[in-house]
Amino acid sequence: MNPRRKSRLYLAMVVLIGISLTTTLVLYALRSNIDLFYTPGEILQGKGERHEKPAIGQRLRIGGMVMPGSVQRDAKTLEMSFQVYDARGAVTVTYTGILPDLFREGQGVVAQGVFAEGNTVHAKEVLAKHDEKYTPPEVEEAMKENHSRPAAAYRGTNTTGNAL
């Protein structure tokens, strides 16, 4: 092998090793920051074809509805627990902190935290989901003041209010 080919081979090997090392380090760093999304049924019965359940200590996000009657608050601290359910089961979520204003029993919620024993998720963050038709009270009042008829009545008219 002539010296020119030899140097190109060494250069190609160094580049491949560098790319492999970089990819490995990036995947290792991301592994601790990846939060998989689970429903309560997937936590209880497994996710996917292989029915993989989350490991104890795994970071995850759980989404579902807050079970009516399951919210329990500690009167002295900000600690609370509630159950999140779907059609296939319910999982207990514990949280310490102030909940979002839209958090209610029977409402959708997404909790991000760590899976623990006893099918419990220790949440670090709780996000309340709302109906896409939700309108803040201020906007609703403004719409009532500015629009005396429903939006459907405005279809088929031009900007002057005359029928098209």
Swiss-Prot record:
This is Cytochrome c-type biogenesis protein CcmE. Pfam families: CcmE (PF03100). It is a single-pass type II membrane protein. It comes from Yersinia pestis. Residues 1-8 are cytoplasmic. Heme binds at H130, Y134. GO terms for cellular component: plasma membrane. GO terms for biological process: cytochrome complex assembly. Keywords: Cell inner membrane, Cell membrane, Cytochrome c-type biogenesis, Heme, Iron, Membrane, Metal-binding, Signal-anchor, Transmembrane, Transmembrane helix. Residues 140-164 are annotated as: Disordered.
